[in-house]
């Protein structure tokens, strides 16, 4: 009953946004706000050359993976993941597009993807009923564990339950479907999000264990969307000496390149690697591995790049 009443109250809320907006200049779009793995780049404790330049020059840092759906006409945006860099990511959107936070979709309960919601609490923003969209285990985790449950109790956030594979109409121009994937689900399940706007469609999937561990083919989602932002955490298994890579499984870039080598060029061009670990050579603009990925017809997500709307 709690799920139902919460969902009904949110459905009443979204009808406030059911007007029609005409004109390309008013078209909503998706923007990349971060491309790094949970710890960002540079990452805490890193003294290696991969982080050295970023420590010396903050302009070279990469925020944690996050995308936003921006509606410039209605002056609203929705975040996909709440990262440690959420204050900077929110400030960027506010200054550049004069838009306000309308909701957050959380993929899972790993530190880089949900802990940013702490900034909505009374110690910081003190927001009122910001919609936060989650799958069932994530819902349970947030309402039963502090400090997150305080955000719910004080009504800083309003948890909106989602069901995997069931599209949720956020407004008449914007639909989101949670797609559950296999990952290290210690505290919650893990989701990717399928976004459908009135002009373009997108798939945001920053974390998955391995493509072959999923009972679905990722290629089907690439085919049915215009842009896919996919897990590119590690380039190869040798990237972090001394770490057991089986404890932190992700599809290596080299595995993805091999899997997709025979895809049509138009399909390859939809793929944008995101969620890059600070050690990933794809973060280095002149690295030959980065050039090889681009030469293969695939892309590497870039902070500040917008997709759809008026380019």
Model-derived features: positions:
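A short, active-site helix/loop in glycosyltransferases that binds the activated sugar's phosphate group
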Residues: 137-147
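Active-site metal-binding motif and surrounding structural segment of the metallo-beta-lactamase
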Residues: 71-133, 224-226
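Bacterial N-terminal signal peptides
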Residues: 6-19
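A short helix-to-beta-strand connector/capping loop
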Residues: 26, 128, 152-158, 171-174, ...
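Core dinuclear metal-dependent hydrolase active-site scaffold
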Residues: 24-93, 159-221, 305-311
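Positively charged n-region of N-terminal signal peptides that target proteins for export
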Residues: 1-5
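Short internal beta-strands
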Residues: 105, 130-139, 229, 272-274
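Cap/insert and terminal regions of metallo-dependent hydrolase folds
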Residues: 196-201, 208-306
């Amino acid at each position: 009953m709690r799920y139902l009443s919460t969902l009904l109250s949110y459905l009443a809320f979204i009808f406030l946004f059911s007007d029609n907006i005409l004109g390309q200049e008013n078209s909503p779009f998706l923007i990349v706000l971060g491309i790094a793995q949970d710890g960002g780049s540079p990452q805490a404790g890193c003294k290696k050359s991969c982080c050295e330049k970023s420590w010396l020059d903050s302009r070279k840092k990469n925020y944690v993976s996050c995308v936003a759906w921006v509606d410039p006409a209605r002056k609203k945006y929705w975040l996909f993941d709440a990262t440690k860099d959420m204050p900077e990511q929110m400030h960027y959107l506010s200054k550049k597009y004069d838009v306000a936070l309308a909701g957050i979709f959380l993929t899972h309960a790993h530190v880089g993807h949900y802990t940013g919601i702490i900034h909505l609490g009374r110690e910081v923003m003190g927001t009122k009923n910001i919609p936060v969209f989650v799958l069932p285990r994530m819902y349970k985790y947030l309402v039963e564990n502090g400090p997150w449950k305080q955000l719910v109790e004080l009504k800083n956030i309003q948890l909106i339950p989602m069901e995997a594979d069931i599209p949720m109409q956020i407004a008449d121009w914007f639909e989101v479907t949670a797609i559950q994937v296999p990952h290290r689900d210690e505290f919650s399940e893990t989701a990717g999000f399928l976004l459908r706007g009135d002009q373009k469609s997108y798939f945001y999937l920053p974390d998955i264990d391995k493509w072959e561990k999923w009972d679905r083919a990722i290629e089907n989602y690439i085919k049915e969307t215009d842009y896919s932002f996919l897990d590119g955490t590690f380039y190869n298994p040798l990237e972090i000496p001394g770490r057991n890579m089986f404890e932190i499984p992700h599809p290596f870039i080299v595995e993805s390149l091999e899997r997709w080598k025979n895809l049509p060029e138009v399909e390859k061009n939809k793929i944008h690697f995101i969620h890059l670990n600070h050690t990933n050579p794809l973060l280095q603009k002149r690295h030959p591995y980065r050039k090889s990925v681009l030469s293969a017809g695939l892309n590497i997500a870039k902070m500040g790049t917008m997709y759809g709307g008026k380019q």
